[in-house]
Amino acid sequence: MDLSGANTEAMLRFHRFHERFNRSIKVQAIGLGLLADEVDAGTPAETIRDRLYARPDWLWGGMPDWTNPRVEIEGALRDIGQAGVVRSFSAFDLFLDELMAELTSWRDFSSATPLDAADTPTNDDEPGDTDRVERIYTRLGASRARISDVWAVYAYFRRARNCIAHREGIASRGLVEAYVAPEIAPTLDRWIVRTGDMTAPALVAVQEGRQIAFSHRQGISASSTLRLIAIDLGRLVIEQLGERGFVYLAARRAFFDDPPLSATLEMTSMVKAFNNAMATRYRVRDYDFREGLRFLRALDLTKRCSARFAELKRRA
């Protein structure tokens, strides 16, 4: 069974967030760009207001102060960028929770030795604080070597996220230190070659005690950086799961999630639902359905999955 390109449910959900988030950020930037064009063309605020009022429920109350619309647009871009960074980390931290829960679920089922004590998210912004991702790599007994080329950028965005969430977007000393870290410049120089991304992250200079002047580009850059780390963590967890653990998780997700996967309910049999999950949703390369079903029988899950599938179809 080739799991080299496979993903678990946690990874799939984060990937879908990343794609959806990128589209959303770009749509917001397009809207502000078109508004900036109107401002540059000298379109009166009243004309813009009348257009928006023509759309039902699109604008409520009066127009914002239009004395200096360029300043308002720049502020909106900053809010999009800052909110985007926080949103990216919210999805990423959820991914970490779900990924480790998947591994813990398999270890509990297989009576394997428990992992070390669970990590806990921290809001600290001290330079010496142990990062949550770093703690997870330690729990997995794994090296961060494969993400060493993105770590400095990750640290920058993690500290920026903390400043936005807990300091109203005011840069801390820790964020400034992350920005001027000697690793940043060489990391950005080799980013495209090492990661395969089309562009390197867009970082902005920060000053302690001043607002972090992010825009939509930093929101996208943060999400792209987190995706690279998520891919590596997903790979490590799949290695620890092995074939048996991966089959167990696919079956648990396909039949025992609440609410159940919509794709499961669309199938006409338990076997088809399981094979669809393995080959399509979780992307097992050159999937051999006979091999997957052998693992399912070896785990003593065939009857349980069949009974659960029948129950789900009755309730659908």
Q: Which residue stretches match the model-derived regions?
A:
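Extended intrinsically disordered or low-complexity regions, especially N/C-terminal cytosolic tails and loops
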Residues: 1-106, 182-316
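A short mid-domain helix/strand-loop element embedded in enzyme catalytic domains
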Residues: 114-140
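Histidine-centered, metal-coordinating catalytic motifs and their short helical/loop contexts
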Residues: 149-182
